[in-house]
Amino acid sequence: MFAIETREVPTQTVLTEQRVVFAHELQAFIDDAMGRLLATADSLGGVTGPAFFIYHDEITDENSGPMEICLPIDPARAEETDAPTRVEAGHREAYTRIPKRLVEYPQILAAYQAVEGWIAENDTEMIDSPREVYFADFMAAGPDELVCDIAFPILPVEAV
């Protein structure tokens, strides 16, 4: 059901906001943080790539975990803000593209499991936390429109 592909992701400077949340708190955190981050990015010339959300641990209704929202900006402008920024190192990713209707918990878990399975079957390793990469206008998209990549940073297959 899920087609898995790989890609190279360049090094990016990102605005970032992190919080430890439960699954039922995710949407409120995303809405609040994205408002702040987008306003800051606009003051720095705008975003330079898709927003991505990094899940540094499993987040469920019973277990909280750290979640990070990242918004790429022009690295030359990063010093102009007091908002937290960092450099996200370039890497290779295995990913699958999903429609808006699957970007809900627990439905989204099947996409994560598909990418994890591909990683195991292809003898590579995850080297950083999984992420959701939002490349389309989520609010304007219909339920069957592709809006998000479920992505895992991996070692290049030949490096394993």
Protein language model annotation of sequence segments:
Residues M1-V160:
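A solvent-exposed interaction/effector surface
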